[in-house]
Design a protein with these regions (language model features):
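N-terminal pre-Walker A segment at the start of P-loop NTPase domains
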Residues: 1-15, 19
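Interdomain hinge/linker elements that couple catalytic modules in large macromolecular machines
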Residues: 4, 150-256
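Hydrophobic anchor at the beta1->P-loop junction of P-loop NTPases
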Residues: 26
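Walker A/P-loop
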Residues: 35
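Short glycine-rich substrate-engagement loop in P-loop NTPases that contacts/grips substrate
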Residues: 57-87
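Conserved P-loop NTPase "ATPase switch" module shared by AAA+ and STAND
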Residues: 84-102
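Structural recognition of the conserved hydrophobic beta-strand(s) that form the central parallel beta-sheet
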Residues: 116-122, 143, 152
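Short regulatory helix/loop adjacent to the ATP-binding pocket of P-loop NTPases
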Residues: 125-141, 155-157
Length: 256
C-alpha cells in the first residue's frame, strides 16, 4: 500500500481559489508532487464535498494514450463535449505545457461561466515571470516545493531524529522519499538531476557547453551554505579546466 503524503498547505491554496474566475496553475520543479496534489488530493476533496464525478474532467497530457489530445483541434472540441449542463465543471489538466497553444485553450475554457480550470505545468514554459505575461493577468499561480520536514514526517515510520537524518541526506522529492532502499534513492536522484533538471536548464537557456554547466553545478552543490564568489569560480575553472568561462557567464548560470 502506497503511503499517503499530506500536502495540506497546497491543498488549501487550491480550495480557497475555487470559483475565482482565474486559471489555477500549479508550478514547481519536476517530481515535487504537482500531479498528486491535483489529481488525487484535490479530486478527493471535490468528491468528498459532493461534486459529481462526471463534473470532474481530467486529462494527463504526458500519457501516451492521450497524445492526440495535445493537438488543440482534438482537445478543445472534446473538452466542450464534456459539458452537458449548466452545473459547475472542474477541469483538472496535468502537464498542460504539452498541449499546443495551451494559453489560448485554457483562456477559452476559463471564459465559460460554469468551468473552473486547474492545471499543472512543468519545465521551462512555466516560470512565474512567464505566467504573468502569457496569461495576461488570468493565471493564478500556486508554486509548489518538495516536501517540508513536517510533510516528510507524515509518511515516515521512524522517530524525528532518524527522520531528520534521512531528510537532510536525500531531500523531499516524494518519489525518492517513498523509495525503499538507499540505492534506489540515489539512482532516482541521479536520474532526476541528469535527465530532468539539467535537460530543462539546457533547453530553456540554449546552453551549448553542457559539460561546463554540469561542472559548475558540481562545484555549487559541494559548497552549499558557503558564500559564492563568481570571480573565484572563474579563476578555478581557468586553472583546472583551462576554461574561458567568464565571471559574468557564471553569474547568469547561477541565476538559471
Amino acid at each position: 500500500m502506497v503511503k499517503e503524503i499530506k500536502r495540506d498547505y497546497y491543498l488549501e491554496q487550491l480550495i480557497k481559489r475555487e470559483g475565482n474566475g482565474l486559471i489555477k496553475i500549479v508550478t514547481g520543479i519536476r517530481r515535487c508532487g504537482k500531479s498528486y496534489l491535483l489529481r488525487t488530493l484535490f479530486k478527493n476533496h471535490l468528491l468528498e464535498n459532493g461534486v459529481d464525478e462526471k463534473h470532474i474532467i481530467e486529462m494527463a497530457f504526458d500519457l501516451f494514450d492521450n497524445i492526440d489530445y495535445r493537438d488543440p483541434k482534438h482537445f478543445y472540441p472534446w473538452a466542450k463535449e464534456q459539458i452537458q449542463d449548466d452545473e459547475k465543471y472542474y477541469f483538472l489538466l496535468d502537464e498542460v505545457q504539452l498541449l499546443d497553444e495551451f494559453v489560448s485553450v485554457l483562456n477559452g475554457l476559463a471564459d465559460k461561466k460554469n468551468c473552473d480550470v486547474f492545471v499543472t505545468g512543468s519545465n521551462a514554459k512555466f516560470l512565474s515571470r512567464d505566467i504573468a505575461t502569457e496569461f495576461g493577468g488570468r493565471g493564478d499561480e500556486v508554486h509548489m516545493y518538495p516536501l517540508s520536514f513536517s510533510e516528510f514526517m507524515s509518511c515516515y515510520d521512524g522517530n524525528k531524529y532518524d527522520g531528520w537524518n534521512e531528510y537532510i541526506t536525500y531531500g523531499g522529492i516524494p518519489l525518492v522519499v517513498l523509495a525503499e532502499t538507499d540505492e534506489q534513492k540515489m539512482n532516482l536522484l541521479d536520474n532526476l538531476f541528469q535527465e530532468t533538471y539539467i535537460s530543462d536548464i539546457v533547453k530553456r537557456n540554449k546552453i551549448r557547453n553542457v559539460g561546463e554547466m554540469e561542472s559548475l553545478l558540481d562545484v555549487l552543490a559541494s559548497a552549499i551554505g558557503a558564500l559564492t564568489n563568481p570571480n573565484k569560480l572563474q579563476k578555478t575553472f581557468k586553472s583546472v579546466n583551462n576554461s574561458k568561462i567568464t565571471a559574468t557567464t557564471i553569474i547568469w548560470r547561477i541565476l538559471f
